[in-house]
C-alpha cells in the first residue's frame, strides 16, 4: 500500500482534480450499460426486435444491424446522464473551486496525494436550504483513482470531511449518490450513513429504474464511534 496524505486544495491542483473527477464519472457509464443490458425490458427488446425482423425479412444482415443499433442506443442512454452531470459540475461549483469551497469557513475541498500524484478528492458545502445551512453539510465529489482503490483512501477522506463538519458545528452530513455507484454506496453505509430517500435525476434514470440515493450521517456520538 503506497503512503498518502490529505490536504486542502491548491490552485495548481485544478487540472489534476478535473481529470480525476472526469475519469471517476466515466467509470459509471459501463456500470450503467451493464445494468440496463440486464433489465427484463431491455432483454425483451434485444431479442424481440431482431427476431421480428428476421421472421419478416429472413435477412441475417438486418438482424445484425438492428442488434448493433439497439446496443449503440443503449450505450448512449447509459452515457447521457453521466455526461450531463459532469458538464453541470464543470460549469458550476468546479469551475472555480477556491470561490465555491475555500471562501468560507463552512466549506472545504481536499485532495489526497500519493508519491506526487493526485489519487483522491472530496468536498463539503452547506446545503442550499437557508433553514438547514447551519445544520447540514453536503458531502460532494468523492473520487479515488482506480489504481489506489482498497487502500483506505476513500474512508480516510470521508472521515476528514466528517471531522471538519463536527469542528464547524454541523450536526448532520448529507449526500446524494447513484444506486449504480456500488462501491461508494457500500463505503458510506459501512461508515454509518443512513438512507433517507431517493429520486430520479433524469428521465433516463427513471426509465432504467436507477434512482439517486439520499444518505445522512448524524454527528456527535456517531463520529466518536467512528474514531474508535
Swiss-Prot record:
InterPro entries xref list: Acyl_CoA_acyltransferase (IPR016181), GNAT_dom (IPR000182), NAT_camello-type (IPR050769)
Reaction(s) catalysed (UniProt annotation): L-lysyl-[protein] + acetyl-CoA = N(6)-acetyl-L-lysyl-[protein] + CoA + H(+)
Annotated TM spans: 36-56, 58-78
Intrachain S-S bonds: none
Topology with respect to the bilayer: Multi-pass membrane protein
GO CC, one annotated term: nuclear membrane
Gene3D superfamilies: 3.40.630.30
Keyword flag Isomerase: no
Domain N-acetyltransferase: 61-217
Molecular functions (GO terms): histone H4 acetyltransferase activity; N-acetyltransferase activity
UniProt-annotated location(s): Nucleus membrane; Cytoplasm, Perinuclear region; Cytoplasm
Function: Has histone acetyltransferase activity in vitro, with specificity for histone H4.
PANTHER family according to UniProt: GNAT FAMILY N-ACETYLTRANSFERASE (PTHR13947), N-ACETYLTRANSFERASE FAMILY 8 MEMBER 3-RELATED (PTHR13947:SF2)
Protein name: N-acetyltransferase family 8 member 3
Organism: Rattus norvegicus
Amino acid at each position: 500500500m503506497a503512503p498518502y496524505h490529505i490536504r486542502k486544495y491548491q490552485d495548481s491542483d485544478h487540472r489534476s482534480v478535473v481529470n480525476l473527477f472526469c475519469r471517476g464519472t466515466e467509470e459509471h457509464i459501463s456500470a450503467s450499460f451493464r445494468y440496463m443490458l440486464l433489465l427484463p425490458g431491455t432483454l425483451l427488446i434485444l431479442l424481440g426486435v431482431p427476431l421480428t425482423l428476421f421472421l419478416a425479412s429472413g435477412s441475417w444482415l438486418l438482424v445484425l444491424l438492428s442488434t448493433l443499433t439497439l446496443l449503440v442506443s443503449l450505450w448512449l442512454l447509459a452515457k447521457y446522464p453521466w455526461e450531463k452531470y459532469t458538464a453541470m459540475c464543470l460549469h458550476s461549483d468546479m469551475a472555480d473551486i477556491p470561490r465555491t469551497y475555500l471562501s468560507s469557513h463552512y466549506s472545504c475541498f481536499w485532495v489526497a496525494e500519493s508519491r506526487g500524484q493526485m489519487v483522491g478528492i472530496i468536498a463539503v458545502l452547506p446545503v442550499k436550504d437557508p433553514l438547514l445551512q447551519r445544520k447540514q453539510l453536503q458531502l460532494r465529489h468523492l473520487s479515488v483513482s482506480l489504481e489506489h482503490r482498497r487502500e483506505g483512501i476513500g474512508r480516510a477522506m470521508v472521515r476528514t470531511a466528517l471531522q471538519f463538519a463536527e469542528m464547524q458545528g454541523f450536526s448532520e452530513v448529507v449526500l446524494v449518490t447513484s444506486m449504480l455507484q456500488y462501491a461508494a454506496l457500500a463505503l458510506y453505509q459501512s461508515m454509518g450513513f443512513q438512507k433517507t430517500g431517493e429520486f430520479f435525476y433524469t428521465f433516463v434514470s427513471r426509465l432504467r429504474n436507477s434512482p439517486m440515493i439520499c444518505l445522512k450521517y448524524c454527528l456527535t456520538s456517531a463520529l466518536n464511534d467512528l474514531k474508535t
